Amino acid sequence: MKPEIKEKITATNQKYLKKFLTEEAPVKLESQLEHMDWSYLDMIHNKEQQRGTFSPLAAMELSEIEANKDKYLATGLDAVKNGKVGAILLAGGQGTRLGFDKAKGMFNIGKTKELYIFEQLVANLMKVTNQTGTWVPLYVMTSEINDGMTREFFEEHDYFGYNKDYVKFFVQEMVPAVDFDGNLLMKSEDSLAMSPNGNGGWFKSLINAGLDKDLKDKGVEWLNVFAVDNVLQQIADPVFVGATIESGCVSGSKVVRKCDPYERVGAMCLENGKPSIVEYYELTPEMAEAKNENGSLQYGFGVILNYLFRVDKLMAIAEKSLPLHVVEKKVPYIDENGTEHKPETPNAYKFETLILDMVYMMDNSLPFEVDREKEFAPVKNATGTDSVETARALLEKNGIETVSYTHLTLPTKLEV
């Protein structure tokens, strides 16, 4: 092990790593220690996340969008046809809450018909490629856990009809977890306990994979970022793209009208005069229930993790560091004796960057309202709210079949 790594282990009094001061460290572990950012350890002593002053931010509502739809559509279609729009699928998660141990996008959302989440999202994107005759570059962010299976799944299913030359994969960066005393946790004898760096880390991970060159070579000027767990995501939506361009904003955020003041979604707002997202738990009752003159909620539009960013602005903020958020989580680990521990309560800190900070670092952002029944079908739980059941119902409501009619048994004789 390199002397400088040993010095850091000693200086930070690493309980689970001390034995490697005298023993030979596994190659994988040594590489992790060499490449990790040790300054993360200082953050656990300054965990408070300071937010600024929130104020409402008006959205472009459905009525205004409809009134100007032809103009926005023409502008957006022109951008897509000229190869200026790319898409980023954030797909690093597992389907754990669905009782599914593979990549979440591999989950079959159909009832008796095979309909995978990845398949439906690609079908949504294909609407635009069919409309424009142009393949939209699709960049899929995976994680260390599901990268191999995700790539294989796309290959096995022939990319669900998409042009494979326009699909690139990259792996989300991982960061170490530490216990409440600042000790780096070990997942195994040869590896730290690592976790993804949050949904704000996607652009840095894309750059580290060398795909910024691909963006430049293809002439991509706008990136539409969307999450894997909403099967009704409309991607590279030309009306959204056109409205954002016409507004003069450098970013756009798709939003839905909240069901009630306390719906558990982040709301678009201004923070110290800059575009931002206030989390539902950060809203005071007064803010949550505050209304405009027309009776609508001042913080009444929730984000659905579908954003549009101008690439040159992304490149500019990539040179700066996004704030790191420290969150408490349950992290399995092995101790210095090799004994495995699976805690039932939070035992460690994880470090995450958040996409809301990317929005905040933009000069402006257009909140763009969409019909929640047409564009918001989250798949977060096996049953109940935002579940497989509710997503299927919304798919069917939008004319997307989840039933295979070859499975239906027709009666051989009708009773009169």
Where are these regions (language model features)?
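Metallocofactor- and cofactor-centric catalytic cores in central/energy metabolism, strongly enriched
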Residues: 106, 113-116
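Low-complexity, highly charged intrinsically disordered N-terminal segments
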Residues: 8-66
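N-terminal nucleotide-binding beta1-loop-alpha1 segment
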Residues: 14-16, 73, 77-101
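A short, N-terminal amphipathic alpha-helix
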Residues: 117-132
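Catalytic core of tubulin tyrosine ligase-like
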Residues: 219-223, 232-236, 241-403
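Conserved small/polar residues in nucleotide/adenosyl-binding loops
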Residues: 406-412
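Extended hydrophobic secondary-structure segments that form protein cores and membrane-embedded regions
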Residues: 87-90, 137-143, 168-173, 223-226
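Conserved beta-loop-beta/alpha segment of the NTase-like Rossmann-fold superfamily
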Residues: 159-160, 164-263
